[in-house]
């Protein structure tokens, strides 16, 4: 024994610096049990015996911490785990951190490892036949008694894996009952606010429809979950669905699982009417219209001793119990009699609808009233093709009803905004007031009393007037003149003056707009000179403040810690002069170039303002990020499956690791949906998700409207516009705005692709280093994944090149539209587009 331990210690010393997996392989060799019978019991003390070599941890804790570690490689963990299972066959039955060990695999979404263990058969003859993962025998939590299908762990992907691992086990899982409250999984799905959604019932049914060979595991209806089972409070799944007005669940229960909606003198319909569950009332009406079997014989035509072929109750017994009026009868083709309710129950639950007395098949008039239940579908393998055709017709009827229950899809076209002269500055003044309000708080926090904020426009100096406009109410007038809308005009004036007084008290230069005159007076002089010595205009001041507040203040905390040292990612707040020059260039030199007459562009043919683009149309292909970058860091994720999941959910994620420096915070470039597999890791202060902010079409449209407003004002200030130039028509403005929005979204696409290329390149460099250091074989799965990532990088490089070329084409088209067709300076348009592109790229 001493020699054995000495060799083991020597082996561990040689391996401890090489591989964490090999160390645990030694643990398994040191911990092989001596008594076979004890190993078959998960409560045995063998599984809780501490091992001194590993800080007195038992084998369950060691294996649990190992496979659940985020650094565990899912491609290499399977072999040592199988070696442990050969000697500890029920180790995944044992409790680890208050839950069975196999439940943690689901909770952490280690689907690849779970699928391998589900199909693994123990080779050791002593333990052959023991189930490694007892998902269909034991609950996931002994305190709540819930099975896997009753918990939030039952995702669509998990159900697909379980079905592939054996339909018999899956059916056993469906039939599991929570002994705490006497419920099955249908009770959990029927409740709208439960952990499992009602759509899970539909997915399970469709899995059975796609795999009819599971009929060999069904002997009768008792081997299928009971849709009429009552819980400890006497509630059936249909009762719970009606209480929640969950119409989808009720439809699935009746049509797919054979819930008896017709029993107890239509008690379900009465309950739905009392609870005002209007959606469920429609479902019950649909069931009565399509699935109810009407009597074909009057009760007074029956003999007193006529007996039902299903429940064996005679007409005389029905009269004695007072059920003559509530129960109706149906005469079969074989001249036997059955209660209509009994026949409907048989049609819902039975696979072969036959007379129970003589086993003669029922006619088509009965089969056409049978719901397309799962149990009946599985038993159709033994029936004729004619029965299959009737079943498919009823199933299509069910799908049509399901589609009819969906809320109507309403497509709201973009609002057509007409910029009248009196309202042209509405948005700019409103946003400027918000900037002024934020300026007070910022100056107070930083103690800066000399900040320059050109808030509003002066009412004195050289003036020009805009045409007045009739207003129907005070709200319209307040919006047009940029005033806060209050019914009490005096209160509105006091609020505005208090804001100006606070700014003046802080030493901030304040200019006041004359709001009393419906003819607005806009000053072109008396503009406060900036500290940078460059002349400002009101529009340039507004753009400068917008960029300053939205760009610099939001990204100055976006720093990372590399090797313990804080490194700023992008600290542009120290170079405000460059930003001011960029903002000023948006307005300069609009009237210095000559124009030649060129045929105008047909806006309607280029862009459809009523079309709402989807994600791919707006942002390009979703393949611009590499989800497999976290395969080895997060553990137990199938690269190819996660790649498909990414393409469906549009998830963007990147992560880089280094052997010399440990990166504690990495930038995350977001998609429209976040997968729970990927966690954002950031340090410092949190900042807004500017990607999602810019993707909102309303925000992009704000920038586009400001773009058009600046160009339109430049034309209005020209004394002698070119003869060929067409004025801004109200009908063309919304189309121009949408065209610029499209340009903004292409800017975002290109910026995201550039960031993704950078992160992927870092990951590929890191993995190339690991491949050489670990001396991995060319056939190793890690090398194959690296090769795939390099191919994806090449594909993304081509995509970003095409995006950049498309962006250049759109830039030239916009310059042509504004310069040649509308008379705006080409240099000014170029600067406008350049600042928008820089703005989008900075916020990514």
From Swiss-Prot:
It is an enzyme of class 2 (transferase). InterPro entries: Znf_RING (IPR001841), Znf_RING/FYVE/PHD (IPR013083). GO terms for biological process: protein ubiquitination; symbiont-mediated perturbation of host ubiquitin-like protein modification. Keywords: ATP-binding, Host-virus interaction, Metal-binding, Modulation of host ubiquitin pathway by viral E3 ligase, Modulation of host ubiquitin pathway by virus, Nucleotide-binding, Transferase, Ubl conjugation pathway, Zinc, Zinc-finger. One of its GO terms (molecular function) is transferase activity. Transmembrane segments: none annotated. Probable E3 ubiquitin-protein ligase which accepts ubiquitin from the E2 ubiquitin-conjugating enzyme UBE2E1/UBCH6 in the form of a thioester and then directly transfers the ubiquitin to targeted substrates. Mediates ubiquitination of host tumor-suppressor-like protein (TSL) targeting it for degradation. Might function as an anti-apoptosis protein by counteracting TSL-induced apoptosis. This is RING finger containing E3 ubiquitin-protein ligase WSV222. ATP binds at residues 229-236. The keyword Hydrolase does not apply. Disruption phenotype: Reduction of host mortality. SUPFAM superfamilies: RING/U-box (SSF57850). Pathway: Protein modification; protein ubiquitination. Interacts with host UBE2E1/UBCH6; this interaction results in WSV222 auto-ubiquitination. Interacts with host tumor suppressor-like protein. It catalyses: S-ubiquitinyl-[E2 ubiquitin-conjugating enzyme]-L-cysteine + [acceptor protein]-L-lysine = [E2 ubiquitin-conjugating enzyme]-L-cysteine + N(6)-ubiquitinyl-[acceptor protein]-L-lysine. A zinc finger (RING-type) spans 308-359. Its EC number is 2.3.2.27.
